[in-house]
């Protein structure tokens, strides 16, 4: 069994977030994610900043359920799946916003990138000697497997169930450690 592969640029819309420039930015102040807010598989929403966005920028830089947010610099490839954890969220320049087309289940593409990023498979695409970057042009050429949608859903469901078990165990361990300290 082999799956068709396609370049990311043919199976998803993606862009870098908006450049932070207080002198030029106009519009409504909205919360945005920066590189520091993206963790492996989750978001840290405890310290959100705001930037001005104009109406015509909302579609491009705004997040929708199922978007993958990936770090472009610092620790390129670090990513998480947006599930509308916060309303009217936007993205800043150091992040790629990846929105899969209908041929890809968002969770499947997320787990694909999580695997590629955590195992170092994206490293050959990085540029920069001191601070690494994953440029849009290189991201566009990544070959993405496109199995039948039912297979994508099954794979994502199994991996999500394991993630839930891991998170549940983390919470239990934290409770046990807290109880042991008392």
Task: Give residue ranges: language-model regions.
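Non-catalytic DNA-recognition/assembly elements of restriction-modification systems
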Residues: 1-18, 141-182
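A short glycine-rich beta-alpha junction/loop motif
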Residues: 2, 89-96, 127-156
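Sequence-specific dsDNA recognition surfaces
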Residues: 5-24, 36-68, 85
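A generic structural signal for short beta-strands and their flanking turns/coil linkers
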Residues: 29, 47, 92-94
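A short beta-sheet element
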Residues: 34-35, 52-116, 135
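Short glycine-enriched loops at secondary-structure junctions
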Residues: 38, 75-76, 127-128
């Amino acid at each position: 069994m082999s799956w068709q592969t396609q370049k990311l640029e043919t199976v998803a819309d993606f862009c870098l977030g908006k450049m932070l420039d207080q002198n030029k930015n106009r519009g409504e102040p909205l919360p945005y994610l920066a590189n520091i807010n993206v963790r492996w598989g989750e978001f840290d929403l405890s310290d959100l900043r705001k930037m001005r966005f104009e109406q015509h920028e909302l579609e491009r830089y705004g997040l929708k359920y199922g978007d993958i947010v990936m770090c472009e610099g610092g620790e390129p490839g670090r990513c998480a799946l947006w599930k509308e954890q916060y309303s009217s969220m936007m993205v800043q320049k150091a992040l790629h916003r990846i929105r899969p087309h209908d041929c890809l289940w968002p969770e499947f593409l997320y787990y694909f990138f999580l695997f590629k990023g955590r195992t170092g498979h994206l490293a050959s695409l990085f540029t920069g000697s001191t601070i690494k970057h994953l440029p849009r042009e290189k991201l566009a050429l990544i070959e993405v497997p496109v199995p039948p949608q039912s297979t994508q859903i099954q794979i994502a469901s199994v991996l999500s169930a394991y993630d839930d078990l891991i998170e549940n165990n983390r919470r239990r361990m934290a409770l046990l450690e807290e109880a042991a300290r008392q």
